[in-house]
């Protein structure tokens, strides 16, 4: 089997005991399974929850705190304890982990987005196992990922992973709640995530985590759109990840084998960039951009809403509504000066595209 880049996401419920505290035996087993694939030549990246679960009891909380300040305090203590556990376990296999804590700003700010990519790739190049978690001790409620399921999908896309393995306490996706309906049927394979499947999943999560099955499916949708196949399920023993990789996992495999990776510029535009304004285009430009993959030229621009600098990301609206978003080559003032004009009517420096097709993401097909 060729070397693969694999992201493993482990949720709180797969790391904790019945009291909600970190279970050292569970961490040991996860590390063993990761080490098996690492020793086989694969690149391994771990997205781990558990900082809050690891720290809340040390602060005197009887259970997982629900307030932001409580979670942040627990995470500040717990992240150190959690990382110490991982370091001790990986040391048994002569492997070195490296900690990366991310927030929304690390994705929405273009330079930080590039830096996150460069750091992870350097760690992989050096044979280190990146251990990634949201920076729960500094994130504010409005800026959090909501759960590490989505973080795992975004990281998988960022580094162009071959597969995302989401480990949970349920062995895959069912057409009904298996805890309530003994007739519930498991899906062993799904080509995609549909609205109907999201309805099956519901929204409830476990008492120690923040992500239910629905959040995992939303993350899966994102991963698939970025060209990453997904497995959702469970397993036991040091061979569990190897079994998943070989198609023998206890869960649901999601995604077509022919998925195409998405370059980082388009990923950033599609999922992370702030929207600074809007460009209005005519029907001809709409047709060319949606169906022909064309760049946006000044001749197709009708108007501009908002004030924005060169390099801003804006939505593009045609007669049929918003058709996508892209990064502009000119400021709003320059676009207004050039709108509706043919190339031979413009100064030389303004004959280039308003939005190049490589800096463009369709939201309509």
Swiss-Prot record:
One GO MF term on file is: ATP binding
UniProt catalytic activity: L-glutamate + ATP = L-glutamyl 5-phosphate + ADP
Annotated PUA domain ranges read: 276-353
Pathway this chain belongs to: Amino-acid biosynthesis; L-proline biosynthesis; L-glutamate 5-semialdehyde from L-glutamate: step 1/2
EC number annotated for this UniProt entry: 2.7.2.11
Ligand binding (ATP): 9, 168-169, 210-216
Its principal location?
cytoplasm
Enumerate the UniProt keywords alphabetically.
Amino-acid biosynthesis, ATP-binding, Cytoplasm, Kinase, Nucleotide-binding, Proline biosynthesis, Transferase
Q: Give the residues the record marks as binding substrate.
A: 49, 136, 148
Read off the HAMAP family from this record: ProB
| Entry's family note | Belongs to the glutamate 5-kinase family.
Q: What is this protein called?
A: Glutamate 5-kinase 1
Q: What broad taxonomic lineage does this protein's source fall under? A: Bacteria, Bacillati, Bacillota, Bacilli, Bacillales
């Amino acid at each position: 089997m060729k070397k693969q880049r694999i992201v493993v996401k482990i949720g709180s419920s797969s790391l904790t005991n019945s009291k909600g505290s970190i279970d050292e035996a569970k961490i040991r087993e996860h590390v063993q399974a990761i080490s098996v694939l690492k020793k086989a030549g694969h690149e391994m990246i771990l997205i781990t929850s558990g900082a809050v679960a690891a720290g809340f009891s040390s602060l005197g909380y009887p259970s997982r705190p629900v307030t932001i300040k409580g979670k942040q305090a627990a995470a500040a203590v717990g992240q150190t304890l959690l990382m110490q556990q991982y370091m001790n376990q990986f040391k048994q296999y002569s492997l070195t982990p490296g900690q990366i804590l991310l927030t929304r700003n690390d994705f929405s700010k273009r330079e930080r987005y590039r830096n996150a990519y460069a750091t992870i790739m350097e760690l992989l190049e050096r044979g280190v196992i990146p251990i990634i978690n949201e920076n729960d001790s500094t994130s504010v409620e409005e800026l959090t990922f909501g759960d590490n399921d989505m973080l795992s999908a975004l990281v998988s896309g960022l580094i162009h992973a071959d597969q995302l393995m989401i480990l949970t306490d349920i062995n895959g996706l069912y057409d009904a709640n298996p805890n309530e309906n003994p007739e519930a049927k498991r899906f062993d394979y799904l080509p995609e995530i549909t609205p109907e499947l999201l309805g099956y999943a519901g929204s409830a999560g476990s008492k120690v985590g923040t992500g239910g099955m629905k959040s995992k499916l939303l993350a899966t949708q994102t991963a698939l759109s970025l060209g990453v196949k997904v497995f959702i399920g469970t397993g036991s023993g040091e061979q569990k990840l190897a079994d998943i990789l070989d198609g023998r996992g206890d869960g649901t495999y999601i995604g077509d084998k022919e998925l195409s990776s998405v370059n980082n510029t388009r990923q950033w535009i599609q999922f992370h960039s702030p929207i600074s304004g809007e460009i209005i285009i005519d029907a001809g430009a709409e047709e060319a951009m949606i169906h022909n993959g064309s760049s946006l030229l000044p001749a197709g621009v009708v108007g501009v809403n908002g004030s924005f600098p060169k390099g801003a990301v804006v939505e593009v609206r045609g007669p049929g509504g918003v058709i996508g978003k892209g990064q502009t080559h000119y400021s709003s003032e320059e676009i207004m000066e050039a709108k509706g004009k043919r190339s031979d009517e413009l100064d030389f420096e303004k004959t280039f595209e308003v939005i190049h097709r490589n800096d463009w993401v369709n939201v309509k097909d």
